[in-house]
């Protein structure tokens, strides 16, 4: 966050400053527990909780001011629409920094967060980098990330998600990216969009939102993504296994823990890369990150060096040894059919004893939800010795898995069952949509 006085913030967002004059020097937060000294607490009045009631707690944590819809115990900028004010403030801050800043937007049906993490690791070696924390990729998370940018920031990496057409266009209206990375068009949020064509149109909004002359970085393996090249007059870089992708993935080999080594090849050079991440799909994510880095001026050799030590956000393909001698693969943050298949492929590639897939409901799949769950269940049964379906909503997974399935009522029952049945050498995958909270199962085993 660049230093801004309370009155200046009020002027930027069209609000009224109340309380003593203070200067905000630290990032904005929505959670009072995450406030930092000198920070701005953004208070929303929701149906079940009113953020304004937590202003004092935010102050104790170090926040010096509040952006809200009514005065609080802290100096406050009062506005009619807090969301719009937050977005306006973020757009203003980035506009002031824009001359020295390269903005990268990342979207796709799956792999956004992992690719964003890889790209941030690469760009951090080339200059001060601010990137989305976790999956804060919506109309609130993106401006919060933008407000973390400072005068010294050289790269701003923004994960951009969507549940409806127009969502990403709204985000690029706040900050037009210099580089737009589109990973894939899958079935995540199909229930909200209604069709893959609608999902493709939504993801394409990132390309359409590029600054004039900005670079689109597109997956050559996904025809829906590759066709987005017509949405821009600027340069296009491609990545993938397809020949001739601009950054091509070749010779993928997995070690005993399912971690890929591969060659990334461009027209000018190539580099061998060993990723410290689980899953063959990480090689494709790495090629996307390398292509985006090339667009940002980072050469392939520096990108691959950085990728060898990259790490992912929590609860994403985390490998951990358990006290019982089993191995936990925690990918519990979120799930859709495509990402679950990738995780199951990773599970099957890890050497060990039995492979146990603990799966929960995949949300927002619309009318095809039951069929998608059955199909993933069958896919799991071909790659795991036991498929544990957690919760009644996950029963179609068990139906698809057939005789390999175990159905358990909830997370506590899953923890109890696993504690009773896990043995040394077993490998257990935990994965579901965020709403299923299967991170509780992973935590219960750790």
UniProtKB/Swiss-Prot annotation:
Q: What class of enzyme is it?
A: ligase
Which pathway, metabolic or otherwise, does it act in?
A: Cell wall biogenesis; peptidoglycan biosynthesis
Instruction: List residues binding ATP.
Output: 108-114
* Pfam families according to UniProt: Mur_ligase, Mur_ligase_C, Mur_ligase_M
What processes does the entry annotate via GO biological process terms? cell division; cell wall organization; peptidoglycan biosynthetic process; regulation of cell shape
Q: Which InterPro entries match?
A: Mur-like_cat_sf, Mur_ligase_C, Mur_ligase_C_dom_sf, Mur_ligase_cen, Mur_ligase_N, MurCDEF_CellWall_CoF430Synth, MurE/MurF_N, UDP-N-AcMur_synth
**A single GO molecular function, which one?**
ATP binding
Name the family: Belongs to the MurCDEF family. MurF subfamily.
What is the organism of origin for this protein?
Answer: Streptomyces toyocaensis
NCBIfam families from the entry?
murF (TIGR01143)
Q: What is the name attached to this protein's record?
A: UDP-N-acetylmuramoyl-tripeptide--D-alanyl-D-alanine ligase
Encoding gene, per UniProt annotation: murF
Catalysed reaction equations from the record: D-alanyl-D-alanine + UDP-N-acetyl-alpha-D-muramoyl-L-alanyl-gamma-D-glutamyl-meso-2,6-diaminopimelate + ATP = UDP-N-acetyl-alpha-D-muramoyl-L-alanyl-gamma-D-glutamyl-meso-2,6-diaminopimeloyl-D-alanyl-D-alanine + ADP + phosphate + H(+)
State which Enzyme Commission number(s) the record gives. Answer: 6.3.2.10
Which keywords does the record carry?
Answer: ATP-binding, Cell cycle, Cell division, Cell shape, Cell wall biogenesis/degradation, Cytoplasm, Ligase, Nucleotide-binding, Peptidoglycan synthesis
